[in-house]
Amino acid sequence: MEAFKEKVERLFQKHEELITRKNVAVEDGNGIFTRYKYPVVTAAHTPVFWRYDLDEKSNPYLMERIGMNATMNSGAIKWNGKYLMVVRVEGADRKSFFAVAESPNGIDNFRFWDYPITMPEDAIPATNVYDMRLTAHEDGWIYGIFCAERHDDNAPAGDLSSATATAAIARTKDLKNWERLPDLKTKSQQRNVVLHPEFV
């Protein structure tokens, strides 16, 4: 039977091979965009130590403890010479969190930062957050606008899946420390919002 340490090393080796795999264009493109063979970020790109308890005593069979279902709908920005995405990472429980993945070229070699984003709550806590869009604003802040989903209090008793959606707003200077601002107030549920990078 393969030793625990060797299994861990193999997990990290496979992960590194995935992250450093060169992406290749699959068609000439139309001059506007180029399609590539591999998705730039998948659930398998999330760090091994997010998904696995690497302690042999508490996880002797090296079972994945925190399942990652998918990565999707990222907001992207070129910042300090790197391509960064705030990725929606969906867990096996279908709840999402945000994490930053960084690449030198925006095509491959996307590597997640060590820790997911810790997003402060609004006055009314959200049951789920997703689909952040980033804007580097002329005021010096990077703004993230995303969907904050909350339980719908008008749903019938026992209905735990009905939800309301609002455009939540947060800002940061470093993509690590975030300040939560009040949600955008609208008459109807609105989460598809654009913030211009300069004052109009």
Q: How would you name each of these model-derived features?
A:
Residues 1-73, 77-127, 135-200:
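Beta-rich carbohydrate-recognition and catalytic domains
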